[in-house]
Amino acid sequence: MVFNTGAALLDAIVLAVVSREKEGTYGYKITQDVRKAIDVSESTLYPVLRRLQKDECLEVYDRQFDGRNRRYYKVTERGMAQLNLYHEEWKNYSRKI
């Protein structure tokens, strides 16, 4: 990968991936979807999910799946506002190059 995958870029990609699912999505699927855009390990991604939860950009809930709990992540209003900010910043950046 040519670009540095700093915290803001990872946050933007994760928020974009999670925002596609209205009812939220689970960690493994988020990892698979993010990997379509950039090469990232689960050990890198889960701290991003925790940080976004702490920053109130994601809400977390558990749901039963095949007899066990699966943790789901859903974008909050604050998360959507942050994603929109990242999108605007990206448009401004790309116009300059």
Question: Could you describe each region identified by the protein language model?
Answer:
Residues 84-97:
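Amphipathic alpha-helical dimerization/coiled-coil segments
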Residues 46-51:
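Short, hydrophobic-biased segments on the C-terminal half of alpha helices
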Residues 65-67, 81-84:
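Short, structured secondary-structure boundary patches
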Residues 2-44:
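N-terminal helix-turn-helix DNA-binding core of bacterial DNA-binding proteins
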Residues 55-69, 74:
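Beta-hairpin "wing" of winged helix-turn-helix
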Residues 38, 53-56:
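Short amphipathic alpha-helical segments enriched in hydrophobics
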Residues 75-80:
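Accessory beta->alpha helical hairpin/"wing" motif in late/C-terminal subdomains of nucleic-acid enzymes
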